[in-house]
Amino acid sequence: MSLVCAIALIFTLFPQIEAKALEHTQTAPLYIYSKDCPEEYMEYALNTVGDFLGSSEYNDITDPWIGTPFTFANPESNIYYFPIYDNGKIAYTFRVYKTYTGDITGILSEALVNDLNEFSAQTNAENPLKIYCKDDDSIIFSKEDSPSSLSFENSANQSEAGMDGSFVVIECKMEDKIEKTVRPRGGDSYINLFPNINYIDVQSGDNYWCVGYVAAAILNYTKIDVTITPKEFMKLYGITDPKKGTYLRNLYYYLIADYVKGTGKFSSSALSFLDMAIEIEEGRPVAISMRNIKNTSTEEGVGNHAVVVRGLDSYRAHFSIWNPWYRFYESIVTLDSYTPAISSTREYSYSRDGRTVYGIKNLA
């Protein structure tokens, strides 16, 4: 998944949130072209993000503030990103959207953080940022002579954003102080597995080898095979073309081979929350395949995406996952709905036609 950088223009303050006195001054406001955020999304974010930040996973966040939300410049865009500031700088984004069931959910991660911090110093009221997501899930940061001058390269969206008047330019800035949810004594059970993924050569989603990356991360963490790479794993199953994937069950077949001592189990369905929690608490990362519910293919594996469940906050029932498209982890409210950060066309569900490899012993 490539990132293409360039930027866009105009001005209007976001009208729905009243700014408060700040304890710390942010490095620079970010002017961005967006639709106004629905009130229910703002209420959800304000009521939820403190639950995430109250976990020991985020102990390094000492002065959190939530910022003005924005969305992509696509006409159909309905995922809103709330910048989460720490000591005046964007540290995370909290993306909020409605699931296929109509419920609101949120995901906290470092998605877009580096780009937003970089562009904030380059934007102003007359020269705002415009973010456009293409069908191939690439992002364009655009800077043009006018907000309407960027012609969409996406054949499905030939009309230009904002022509209906729904888009304005907002000043994205620190808005409300976040109060971290205080855990009762002994109530914070946050467990992180394989905290360092830098040894994995992440390809940022530019191929179909998500199972290979998930397998390599888990196998290296468990010391089952400390040298295997995603490429080597995929080659075991005759795959060298980056446009071809493999089934999650092949990780299971690898695990139960004689030289791996028979560790691992496979399920053609999703684990319950309790069973998933037991795996994490026992130090066993779980590989899952999530179904793209917007993909209508009936062929097994088509439209699926593999991620690793590698952390658990048992107090608020939040999981931490690693999507092999990214070099960071994500805290997620529910595994029933997952929309990647750089997408407007995909929604994955683990509970609907999910696959699971679990019981993976740590042999270190």
What is the predicted role of each segment?
Residues H24-A91, Y97-D115, E232-A364:
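Conserved active-site-adjacent core of cysteine acyl-enzyme catalytic domains
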Residues P75-I79, N87-K89, Y97-D103, N124-P128, ...:
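Short, solvent-exposed coil/turn segments at beta-strand boundaries
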Residues S2-L3, V211, V302:
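Active-site-proximal structural scaffolding
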Residues L22-H24, E43-N47, D51-F52, N59, ...:
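Active-site-adjacent structural segments surrounding the nucleophilic cysteine of cysteine proteases
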Residues S2-T12:
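Bacterial N-terminal signal peptides
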Residues I10-T27:
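Sec-dependent signal peptide cleavage junction
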